[in-house]
């Protein structure tokens, strides 16, 4: 247990959400001495922003001097502490996020969807989310040569969008 990475989460009031308070500073000092992460989060703010649409949420977060909601920070830090990453699959009807361990090979990642995908894995059409956003269209990105064919030894990267080719 002592070798596990830990994250300390301090629930603070709204006015302390960006800079913390005297109690969160004590926790920060301790955590830093142990090389651990500290996240300050206001449950009250998180509750309020859960009721807002995206534009209102962003405006409210900015008005508080925060970069992003505390819950987003907690999720990202949690993924990091657990060595997890996310890849996506997308089709005409749905886009789905899949959680995997970092450095998972493409066939094992495909196996998260269905074991037949792992057994019959051939290749994966792959583009990173940030590259796709530049083109705003999968076909345009593919035409520009940004979609890669990756094989069995490819380590899936956080934010990859993948279309698996496999034999049944």
Regions found by a protein language model. Name each.
Residues 1-157, 167-168:
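C-terminal-of-GTPase-core extension/linker across diverse P-loop GTPases
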């Amino acid at each position: 247990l002592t070798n596990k990475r830990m994250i300390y989460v301090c629930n603070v009031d709204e006015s302390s959400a960006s800079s913390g308070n005297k109690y969160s500073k004590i926790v920060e000092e301790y955590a830093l001495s142990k090389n651990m992460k500290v996240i300050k989060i206001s449950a009250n703010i998180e509750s309020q922003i859960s009721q807002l649409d995206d534009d209102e949420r962003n405006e409210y977060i900015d008005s508080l001097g925060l970069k992003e909601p505390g819950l987003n920070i907690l999720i990202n830090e949690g993924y990091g502490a657990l060595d997890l990453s996310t890849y996506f699959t997308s089709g005409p009807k749905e886009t789905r996020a899949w959680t995997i361990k970092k450095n998972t090979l493409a066939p094992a990642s495909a196996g998260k969807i269905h074991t037949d995908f792992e057994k019959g894995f051939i290749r994966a059409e792959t583009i990173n989310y940030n590259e796709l956003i530049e083109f705003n269209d999968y076909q345009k990105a593919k035409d520009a040569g940004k979609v890669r064919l990756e094989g069995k030894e490819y380590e899936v990267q956080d934010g990859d969008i993948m279309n698996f080719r496999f034999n049944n």
